[in-house]
């Protein structure tokens, strides 16, 4: 039994244009005999087909092909008219015996198949004389072989169209592995999924040009200087690139964002693994350039910039660092003793010079301790003035009692405190 094969309209032009069997023209009497037999049984057996072939003078294989084509036409017509296909009628008849092919015959057929997958009628008749098999069985053998092994055989017809077709100019159609690469935040090329294609089959617009631009990132001589060397900062703008950007349209891989460390943690308490995660963006504060975990330098912006800047690189190299005073700036005030008076704290605040313009700009977080900021807020004159009306709303008796308690418990000066300590 022949395996299902593509129709003549779907075969390549090379197979269709080769020497084919001449079309058989049926006479009216032959057509009537065939149709009468078809009405009785659409699926005649080998014995019925042989008797019909002898009666009308047509080879039995041609009678079998006629019944196959007639069943296909009737099935299409029943589907268009939404009628059920009756199927087999009567008892099933005997089928053709399976043709036994010897080893020598198979070797001859395989050699012919390797030379040509679509032999013409002349080649099939020659093989029939050499092997002793009927030509119709040889045709069925080639159909089954093409269906079971579509990639084998010689003189494979070239398929028209498609991205991975043969290269123009007579190039060999053997596939080649083309890998697209891109450059990420690490400054090195990463291979993308491989795509099998024939050489020269890719379009010259998008992927080929992009892969050519991304290829220099894979060269060792060009990738080596990118490690550990800081490039000059841009003259204008808030963006700085520590690694070459990927080409337009090149493949990319998503990377986890890199978050700055907690402002309250010191450098020793931070988790180096968590803070060292690679990421496409990094937040940095003004400061010197520091080398990344892998040795790639990331250049910080000039110290005149006070606002945080975003750069494509290894990650936050100096983000969340402790505040470092500039030249000529006073150090941050230290927290006063618990028993010091409010006037002493106000004097300390007045003695501190105003911060520079760079420090007055808003920052993501403050580097000063929270306790010191709370003391400064409570001791500020503006806060005391705003809180004075709340103190005056108390009852006169309570206000006098609080004033007497305040007069009895006056704060001790530094000399009195030292004298009290010496007496104790």
From Swiss-Prot:
Transmembrane feature ranges: none
Basic and acidic residues bias locations: 265-274
Record's signal peptide: none
Gene3D superfamilies in the record: Homeodomain-like (1.10.10.60)
Annotated localization: Nucleus
Any matching Pfam family: Homeodomain
Principal subcellular localisation of the protein: nucleus
Comp. bias regions, Polar residues: 1-10
GO molecular function: DNA-binding transcription factor activity, RNA polymerase II-specific; RNA polymerase II transcription regulatory region sequence-specific DNA binding
CDD domains xref list: homeodomain (cd00086)
Protein function: May be involved in transcriptional regulation.
Alphabetical list of PANTHER family matching this protein: DOUBLE HOMEOBOX PROTEIN 1-RELATED, MIX-TYPE HOMEOBOX GENE 1-RELATED
Protein name: Double homeobox protein 4-like protein 2
């Amino acid at each position: 039994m022949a395996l299902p094969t593509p129709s003549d309209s779907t075969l390549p032009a090379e197979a269709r244009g080769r020497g084919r069997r001449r079309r058989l023209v049926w006479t009216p009497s032959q057509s009537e005999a065939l149709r009468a037999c078809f009405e009785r049984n659409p699926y005649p057996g080998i014995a019925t087909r042989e008797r019909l072939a002898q009666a009308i003078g047509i080879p039995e294989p041609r009678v079998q092909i006629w019944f196959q084509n007639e069943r296909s036409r009737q099935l299409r017509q029943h589907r268009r008219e939404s009628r059920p296909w009756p199927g087999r009628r009567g008892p099933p008849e005997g089928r053709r015996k399976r043709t036994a092919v010897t080893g020598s015959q198979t070797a001859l057929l395989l050699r012919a198949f390797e030379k040509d997958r679509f032999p013409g009628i002349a080649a099939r008749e020659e093989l029939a004389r050499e092997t002793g098999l009927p030509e119709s069985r040889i045709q069925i053998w080639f159909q089954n072989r093409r269906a079971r092994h579509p990639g084998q055989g010689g003189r494979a017809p070239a398929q028209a169209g498609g991205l991975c077709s043969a290269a123009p100019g007579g190039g060999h159609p053997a596939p080649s592995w083309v890998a697209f690469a891109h450059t990420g935040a690490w400054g090195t090329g990463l291979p993308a999924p491989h795509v099998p294609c024939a050489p020269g089959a890719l379009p010259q617009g998008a992927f080929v040009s992009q892969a050519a631009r991304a290829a220099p990132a894979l060269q060792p001589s060009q990738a080596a200087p990118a490690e550990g060397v800081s490039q000059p900062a841009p003259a204008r703008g808030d963006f700085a690139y520590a690694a070459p950007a990927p080409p337009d349209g090149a493949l990319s891989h998503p990377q986890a964002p890199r978050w700055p460390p907690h402002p309250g943690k010191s450098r020793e308490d931070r988790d180096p693994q968590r803070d060292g995660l690679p990421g496409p963006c990094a937040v940095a504060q003004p400061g010197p350039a520091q080398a990344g975990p892998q040795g790639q330098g990331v250049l910080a912006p000039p110290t005149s910039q006070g606002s945080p800047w975003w750069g494509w690189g290894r990650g936050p190299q100096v983000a969340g660092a402790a505040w470092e005073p500039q030249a000529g700036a006073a150090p941050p005030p230290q927290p006063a003793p618990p028993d010091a008076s409010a006037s002493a704290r106000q004097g300390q605040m007045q003695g501190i010079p105003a911060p520079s313009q760079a420090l007055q700009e808003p920052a993501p977080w403050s580097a000063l301790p929270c306790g010191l900021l709370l003391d400064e807020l409570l001791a500020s004159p503006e806060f005391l003035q705003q809180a004075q009306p709340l103190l005056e709303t108390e009852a006169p008796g309570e206000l006098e009692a609080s004033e007497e308690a305040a007069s009895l418990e006056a704060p001790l000066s530094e000399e009195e405190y030292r004298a009290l300590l010496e007496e104790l």
